Amino acid sequence: MDFTAVLAQIKPKLGCVADNLAAIEGQIIKAREAKADLIVFPELALSGYFLKDLVPEVALRIDSPEILHLIELSRGISITIGFVEESDDYHFFNSALYLEDGIIRHLHRKVYLPTYGLFDEQRYLAHGESFRAFDTKFGRFGMLICEDMWHLSASYILAMDGATTLICLSSSPARGIDGDSLGSAAAWQKLTSTTAMFLNCRVLYSNRVGFEDGVNFWGGSEYIAPSGESVVRGALLEEDFITARVDEGALRRERIFSPMIRDENLFVTMQELQRIANERGR
């Protein structure tokens, strides 16, 4: 079915969960007033990104008052939100929730934690162990968190699991100059476009803005059609409220015109990956 999605390109305050929750609620109210069906927030929207030793201080259990409040807000609009999750055994995850009709439809824990260059996630966080598609009012979705999308297998697994829409939550820093754009922006635009085109799927990409410890996050949130075309894209380096009309007909047309997923041979892929795993284990 057709639906309207909002990409909430915000600038979270580092370590300030209460302030961020208030700002997030304001964006949700604005999206509901605009008659949107879904709102997508960036990675770690509730806490900010470069947390380091603050991780245990900002972590939330899924039954915390803050999460329960967001669940209640989802009775009027579907919500995707990034936060630091504390598990029952006191592990901390970079997680994302998909909330709909007053329930948690899906919880994704970031699998690939970057620990190079600017990034140090593995020092403070545990990694997730699965990629699973899930059903929503708007079809079958899959969620990825930033670095997850740079691993081809992640998007492929979700597509093979039936996802026709991929949501990627991101906290991508601005790096490099590429003509009139940023190198990091150009790289992400190529990645999201190629993923959508090869997997005949839609991509909703929500990236944050603002500064933390002198690092600037670049924004540029966008909706990419199954053809790989960017339908709408947010501003660079400043907050934005991007509204995207997601057309089911475009998905149907692209899958008829270029049936990549129909012709994908999952069993050959599994067979060859198993062969490689066996050979490496010798």
Task: Give each language-model segment a name.
Residues 1-7:
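Extreme N-terminal starter segment of soluble prokaryotic enzymes
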Residues 9-15:
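Short polar catalytic/cofactor-binding loops
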Residues 17, 26-101, 105-107, 173-194, ...:
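Cys-nucleophile CN-hydrolase/nitrilase-fold catalytic domain and related Cys-dependent amidase chemistry
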Residues 22-36, 153-162:
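Short amphipathic alpha-helices and their capping/turn segments at secondary-structure boundaries
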Residues 62-65, 87-165, 169-191, 255-261:
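Active-site catalytic loop in hydrolytic enzyme cores
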Residues 62-80, 146-240:
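CN hydrolase (nitrilase-like) catalytic-core segments centered on the catalytic cysteine
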Residues 81-83, 94-98, 132, 221-223, ...:
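Short beta-strand scaffold segments in enzyme catalytic cores
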Residues 249-282:
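A short C-terminal boundary segment appended to hydrolase-like catalytic domains
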